[in-house]
Design a protein with these regions (language model features):
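Extracytosolic ligand-binding ectodomains
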Residues: 2-4, 15-18, 32-393
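Twin-arginine (Tat) signal peptide motif
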Residues: 4-19, 23-26
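Sec/Tat signal peptide C-region and signal peptidase I cleavage site
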Residues: 26-32
Length: 393
């Protein structure tokens, strides 16, 4: 029978060190996996909470897919995480959140889905060394020359020429401007009016209305219709925009509509009882109506992740933006070198598989804005038809 040596304090210490070494070796692969964080600052409470959640859901869906593929950056295994912070749609809160995201979570990129917050971050992001992933179509976002900004959707100005030509061809060249009165709508009108006139059109009435505070638009619409327009320019959030269209039809208007990109045709159709009242309207392509195979597959996958829900533009654009951002990190070989990551965004978008780029982003221009095609949609004979936005190839 073999006798065991007594466990002296020295032998116990030696055994403990050996066990620790074995445990460390076993845990090595797990410890080697770095966590790469992407920030999000947007509305997650208040009236715009659902909008902010739609954006975040698209981002989180992308991260789940990326992590399932065991990603590597710079030869190291990584896990991607989104760090979401609520800014209540308040730019000052966005700025506070960004400071926290960069200092505490070391985020190299922060996605913000509203222009006020984007502009707030652009005052400091180059100095603080983080990329602004900007989900807004306001042209000034990339016109300012910020070297660390990605504008995720196309500029809304890319819609003006093709949308105008479409309704002019179907209905005529007289337009009445009855959009909303908030800053974003004012920016749209300021760009749309000269674009319409450049094509030989005439603006016969201008009557902005408070879409966010009213549901009765009969008075404002009646004033515009008194000038006998062929087309109405409308736009704000989807529900009030739909009510403007509905009330215009009830007042006898038979013409077309240019719908600014804040409103979505499929969401409007649910308010007015289908596409028939929207006949002749043109706006951005609803994700739910895009018939491209890769888009239909995206809608199906989204429905499995979020049962009973249909994705909109907010989910789709930002889903692809996260895929592109991580791909840019991989191409740059770094999750922290923001200049190198930003420089690889064009190549990253171009290298994405169609299934993770259902919106068909073609790349990124020298100012940091995405390049797209076929994002317009019009209602003809009660159905959606695609309209090429050739101004932004």
């Amino acid at each position: 029978m073999t006798a065991f040596a007594p466990l002296t304090r020295r032998r116990v210490g030696t055994l403990a060190l050996a066990c620790a070494a074995v445990a460390a070796a076993a845990a090595g692969p797990a410890l080697a996996q770095e966590v790469v964080k992407i920030g999000y600052s947007g509305p997650l409470s208040g009236g715009a909470a659902q909008y902010g959640k739609n954006v975040l859901d698209g981002m989180q869906m992308a991260v789940s897919e990326i992590n399932a593929a065991a990603p590597e950056i710079g030869g190291k295994k990584v896990k991607i995480e989104i760090v979401p912070l609520d800014d209540k749609y308040n730019p000052s809160e966005t700025a506070i959140n960004a400071q926290r995201l960069v200092q505490q979570h070391k985020t190299a990129a922060i996605l913000v889905p509203h222009s006020g917050g984007i502009f707030a971050l652009q005052t400091t992001n180059e100095r603080s060394n983080f990329i602004v992933l900007a989900y807004s179509s306001v042209p000034q976002i990339t016109n300012r020359g910020n070297k660390l900004t990605l504008r995720i959707p196309p500029e809304f100005t890319s819609y003006i020429d093709p949308f105008s030509k479409y309704v002019m061809g179907r209905f005529g060249k007289k337009v009445a401007l009855v959009g909303a009165d908030h800053d974003y709508a004012k920016a749209w009108v300021a760009a749309f009016k000269p674009g319409w006139e450049k094509l030989g059109g005439t603006v016969v009435a201008e009557n902005a209305m408070s879409y966010n505070r009213a549901t009765d638009f009969y008075s404002g619409v009646s004033k515009a219709l008194a000038e006998k327009p062929d087309v109405l320019f409308v736009g704000g959030a989807s529900e009030p925009t739909a009510l403007v269209v509905k009330q215009a039809r009830e007042l006898g208007f038979k013409g077309g509509f240019v719908v600014m990109d804040q409103a979505k045709l499929d969401e409007m159709a649910r308010v007015v009882g289908g596409y028939a009242p929207l006949e002749g309207a043109i706006g951005v392509m609803p994700v739910s109506e895009d018939t491209k195979p890769e888009n239909k597959a995206f809608v199906e996958r989204f429905g499995k992740v979020y049962p009973g829900r249909i994705p909109g533009s907010e989910a789709q654009w930002n889903y692809t933006a996260v895929h592109a951002t991580v791909k840019a990190m991989q191409l740059a070989g770094s999750a922290s070198d923001t200049k190198a990551i930003h420089a690889k965004l064009d190549e990253a978008y171009k290298s994405l598989r169609p299934d993770v780029n259902p919106g068909g982003v073609k790349g990124v221009d020298e100012r940091g804005g995405t390049l797209t095609t076929e994002r317009g949609a019009a209602v003809r004979d009660g159905k959606i038809e695609a309209v090429m936005t050739v101004a932004n190839k």
